Design a protein with these regions (language model features):
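Short active-site-proximal "capping" loops at secondary-structure junctions
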Residues: 2, 25-26
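Alpha-helical cap/lid subdomain in secreted, periplasmic
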Residues: 9-19, 26, 32-151
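Catalytic nucleophile-elbow at a beta strand-turn-alpha helix junction centered on a G-D-S/GDSL motif
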Residues: 1-8
């Protein structure tokens, strides 16, 4: 999903540099490895949009806890602000798991003082025919949610 966010355009819209690094199909475990090179540059903020791929094999609370572990690892590695991004709805049997994971993410963000980018404004109408990825309408909402956070 994040691969359709044009970092350069988003940066121009919010008035500062934005780098988008998509890792399609990645799980929270894989992100431990993918993030390390990016953290060497000490970014001002890291926004984590991860977890949907974990829901196929793990319970929603465990997925949220893995995201939190990743966020804590980032905080312990460099002086950066961590923001979490809600999982986006789906039109399959995992949609309820997405909602449950998002509730846990909200609680964990509150407990840790992190911001959470909400995506409840993306409905099934924002999904493609397969029901798992965003269509053009959903991509616009997704982009705008990140833009609103970064402004």
């Amino acid at each position: 999903m994040i691969s359709r966010i044009p970092g350069r355009d988003l940066g121009k819209a919010v008035g500062h540099r934005v780098i988008v690094k998509p890792f399609s199909g990645a799980t929270t475990k894989a992100m431990n490895h993918y993030l390390k090179p990016s953290l060497e540059f000490s970014p001002n903020e890291v926004i984590l949009h991860i977890g949907t791929n974990d829901l196929k094999t793990r319970e929603p609370k465990a997925v949220a806890e893995s995201i939190v572990d990743l966020a804590r690892q980032i905080e312990s590695t460099c002086d950066t602000t961590v923001t979490l991004s809600e999982l986006v709805c789906r039109k399959d049997k995992l949609d309820q798991a997405v909602k449950t994971a998002n509730k846990h993410l909200g609680k964990f963000c509150h407990q840790n003082g992190w911001k959470l980018i909400h995506h409840e404004n993306i409905s099934y109408n924002g999904l493609n025919k397969g029901g798992l990825h965003l269509n053009s309408k959903g991509n616009v909402q997704f982009y705008n949610n990140f833009k609103s956070h970064l402004e």
